[in-house]
């Protein structure tokens, strides 16, 4: 449900656009669907394009015409993985788009205790507001910095640094470790930052780093067995 005005309901739909990168054909398709059904287009803060003002009877038809997946599958899930231009920017320190797309594929629609946002950026300038997200992955010359618990909602919170100077693989598995720990230990409805505050950052960081070391050791053993 998008809007109720004078007793009439209109709806909005938001197709999946990984990292905010979209092909010209898909962008034209979204515009054509909005035009066909009299909708308005809105560039969202989550790096997607929403079609707003649709009539109830047109929602399903609009999705069929788009032929795209929805941007959000559940209210309590990983909402999106935002990315900066990175490889198209002179300031980028790593190929963070490659890592970001890998994270997006892994966590698209993944269920969480509360809505969760992840951002992957190519340098410390953090053009996609990484430090206002639940999990932030920031590239530097020496590797990736991982922070957790950021928020820009009703209770703004800066994230806590968890690890730094990780390789691409290590950064991916660190995000996975944070996600798993959050899902296993947090209360339903609890934002990641609130969870960290409840158990303390010292415990959160210690537990996550221990789990991460175990995960990496297991991965090394599996790789050795497959050689």
Q: For each predicted feature, which ranges?
A:
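Small-residue-enriched alpha-helical segments and adjacent helix-cap loops
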Residues: 13-141
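Intrinsically disordered, low-complexity polar/charged tails and linkers
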Residues: 1-11, 22
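N-terminal charge/polar-biased segments
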Residues: 1-3, 201-227
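Flexible, glycine/charged-enriched surface loops at secondary-structure junctions
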Residues: 39-45, 112-116, 184-198, 217-225
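Short, conserved aromatic-histidine micro-motifs
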Residues: 109-111, 145-158, 216-219, 223-224
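Mobile "lid/hinge" segments at catalytic clefts and subdomain interfaces of large enzymes
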Residues: 122, 131-191, 205
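A glycine-rich phosphate-binding loop feature that marks nucleotide/adenosyl-phosphate handling sites
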Residues: 120-125, 194-202
